[in-house]
Design a protein with these regions (language model features):
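Short coil/loop residues immediately preceding or within conserved phosphate-binding loops
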Residues: 68, 102, 154
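Beta-strand elements of modular eukaryotic interaction domains
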Residues: 46-49, 64, 89, 96, ...
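Active-site helix/loop of acyl-thioester processing domains in fatty-acid/polyketide metabolism
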Residues: 73-95
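Conserved positions in beta-strands of structured domains
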Residues: 103, 122-124
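HotDog/MaoC-like acyl-thioester-processing domains
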Residues: 1-24, 113, 124-215
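Catalytic strand-loop segment that frames the active site of acyl-thioester-processing enzymes
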Residues: 1-74, 87, 212-213
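A cross-kingdom feature marking solvent-exposed beta-strand/loop segments within repeated
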Residues: 94-115, 129, 133
């Protein structure tokens, strides 16, 4: 999020970020090293790592999708990415998700006709819509991990479009964006980042924007 990158961070937000990342990493280490023990509470809420939520598809860019410049239309790329993300969220939740928003749309490089294009979508965060709408930055189980049967849950999906060239063995990320879906009810797994860098990235993309109105 470019706006977030330019915004100064309050000290209390900085402290909260450190605590949040530490908690994420503690839980993800358990999920990685001792998966059979990776539960959150007496309800046996499941834990999954971000890599376990990946869905992909691969296709050749066709001339039917070109724009006036002779390159693949950006709206087509967004639609294909959205369809993959929707299918991913549906598979993950077991109930049809509702679209909330698309953000952090980044067109980095053009896609040419004939390019081999891979779309990859994975979940980076699952939480309640108002999980951080509070006047305090205390790290609580209820705003980080707790799941429930009759509450709304937001599923945040990271989507990338990647041109892969088998001849040069050089993949290029051409597009990336975030999509948020919402589902109502059901006990969803908690999705955890697998590295400290990934945890910081999730905080900046998902958590910090929810706190930016407090500054």
């Amino acid at each position: 999020n470019r706006k977030m990158d330019k915004m100064p961070m309050r000290e209390e937000v900085r402290v909260f970020r450190k605590q949040w990342v530490k908690k994420m990493r503690e839980m993800s280490r358990v999920a990685k090293e001792m998966p059979s023990r990776a539960v959150l509470d007496e309800k046996l809420s499941k834990i999954v790592l971000t890599s376990q939520t990946v869905h992909e598809n691969l296709f050749v860019a066709q001339p039917q999708q070109v724009n006036l410049s002779g390159r693949i239309f950006g709206g087509f790329l967004l639609r294909r990415g959205f369809e993959l993300a929707l299918a991913n969220a549906y598979t993950f939740a077991g109930t049809f998700p509702l679209f909330v928003n698309m953000s952090d749309v980044d067109f980095r490089a053009p896609v040419e006709v004939g390019d081999l294009l891979r779309f990859r979508a994975h979940i980076i965060h699952v939480g309640e819509p108002g999980e951080f709408d509070k006047k305090t930055l205390e790290l609580k189980e209820t705003n980080v991990f707790e799941s429930g049967n009759d509450i709304e849950r937001d599923i945040v999906m990271q989507v990338e479009a990647i041109v892969v060239n088998p001849k040069t063995v050089r993949p290029t990320v051409t597009n990336s964006f975030l999509i948020t879906f919402r589902v109502n009810g059901g006990l969803l797994p908690t999705v955890l980042p697998e590295s400290t860098d990934e945890a910081f990235g999730v905080f900046e993309k998902v958590i910090r924007p929810k706190l930016c109105g407090w500054d």
